[in-house]
Amino acid sequence: MVTAAMVKELRERTGAGMMECKKALAHTDGDMEKAVAYLRERGLAAAAKKASRVAAEGLVEAYIHGGGRIGVLVEVNCETDFVAKTDDYKALCKDIAMQIAAAKPEYVRREEVPAEQIEKEKEILRNQALNEGKPEKIVDKMVEGRIEKYFKEICLLEQPFIKNPDVTVQQMITEAVAKIGENINVRRFVRFELGEGLAKRQDDFASEVMAEINK
């Protein structure tokens, strides 16, 4: 029987898409090593190797939402100008820009989060746990679990993909790497929201972006 844990392990080992991993495990009767070989034979396990290649071409994608109330610029790199001009790559860049507009990440990846910000958040989470009456001996484990959730909120690549929350943005990009055949890297982004930091009424821009995606 093919389990979700088996599919997850195979995806982590090969970088192949979820459906490809399910098919490979079914084809090999759940034998993990044979499934890895099966994917490699079909060129579906190449994403991890491609990740080490230089990606210096690409696009700067712009997305404006709600009559100019939210604006996003994101630089997404690939290896060749040819791929950067393809419809699949352009669609990927647009999806990433809309993700940023809707989900408000602060960083691309967790390695970019300043150490002092992480320590400050851990202290807040620790105090919250203690105020909830949790035993001090388990507080540290709770903090580690909650800080992982925090990374999933503020780091673009760890966020659930808005079009398919069953996968992260990184997993979505990994699947695109396998399909397109080149390394793809989100280098940087900037997000502007009209009146950000000023006292104003609260707007649910995330829901508005999702409504536009689902049209």
From Swiss-Prot:
Q: What's one GO-annotated cellular component?
A: cytoplasm
Gene Ontology MF, one: translation elongation factor activity
Q: Which domain of life is it from?
A: Bacteria
Subcellular location per the Swiss-Prot or TrEMBL entry: Cytoplasm
Among its keywords, does the record have Protein biosynthesis?
Answer: yes
Chain positions covered by the region annotation Involved in Mg(2+) ion dislocation from EF-Tu: 80-83
Q: Give the matching Pfam families.
A: EF_TS
According to its UniProt entry, what is the function of this protein? Associates with the EF-Tu.GDP complex and induces the exchange of GDP to GTP. It remains bound to the aminoacyl-tRNA.EF-Tu.GTP complex up to the GTP hydrolysis stage on the ribosome.
**What protein name does the entry list?**
Elongation factor Ts
Provide the species name. Heliobacterium modesticaldum (strain ATCC 51547 / Ice1)
